[in-house]
Amino acid sequence: MLEQVCQLARNAGDAIMQVYDGAKPMEYARKQDDSPVTAADIAAHTVILEGLRTLTPDIPVLSEEDPPAWEVRQHWQRYWLVDPLDGTKEFIKRNREFTVNIALIEQGKPVLGVVYAPVLKVMYYAAEGKAWKEECGVRKQIQVRDARPPLVVISRSHTDDELTEYLQQLGEHQTTSIGSSLKFCLVAEGQAQLYPRFGPTSVWDTAAGHAIAVAAGAHVHDWQGKTLDYTPRESFLNPGFRVTIY
């Protein structure tokens, strides 16, 4: 099933690129939470939703672009969790750092994850405790790697005082910034060692990257030390968290 989901992510990426490569300035609307949504978000959502319903008609889908009501999903034990276009701000700026995120959740845990960056043509995916990166037709298994000083990856679009204070107290380190769930993937492939997050994220932002990072040997915990949990709840917001190899 993993290969079929990877192909769905590629198909969604193709739909996104049709909008991305257009000559017109990027048009977008604002959702209720003031986050932007574009025609590419909707096109990718449609591709993934139709594909998953064909592939696994018995598994419900929770997508950022059409989340079911709480009453519908409150008892879900197994479901797909999808962000058709993670990093819409990056997409609007045409800076390449946006992804398609697809995760399978079982009993609150992401057991399969696919992250595809369509401009970069890089795919990360994980299942059954193993993680891979595929680029230019070459697939390799990935795992975390220690480095001193550690490289800390942070959000390109979200910074806050808590993060600034945390980094000041961290000790010797280097930083890099990148958009979307690629931050999880940098830790998973050994390019970075830590991704701290204090600002708001939603479950669809993190689930696929979470699966990949853990399969590669990283830990994904909130600031109280608890693993991020995807058991259905009324709010889609995550607590603050960190992805770390330590």
From Swiss-Prot:
Substrate binds at E64, L85, D86, G87, T88, D205. It is found in: Cell inner membrane. Mg(2+) 2 binds at D83, D86, D205. It is an enzyme of class 3 (hydrolase). Its cofactor is Mg(2+). It is a peripheral membrane protein. CDD domains: CysQ. GO terms for cellular component: plasma membrane. Keywords: Cell inner membrane, Cell membrane, Hydrolase, Magnesium, Membrane, Metal-binding. It catalyses: adenosine 3',5'-bisphosphate + H2O = AMP + phosphate. One of its GO terms (molecular function) is 3'(2'),5'-bisphosphate nucleotidase activity. The keyword Ion transport does not apply. One of its GO terms (biological process) is 3'-phosphoadenosine 5'-phosphosulfate metabolic process. The keyword Cytoplasm does not apply. Its main location: membrane. Belongs to the inositol monophosphatase superfamily. CysQ family. Converts adenosine-3',5'-bisphosphate (PAP) to AMP. This is 3'(2'),5'-bisphosphate nucleotidase CysQ. It comes from Salmonella typhi.
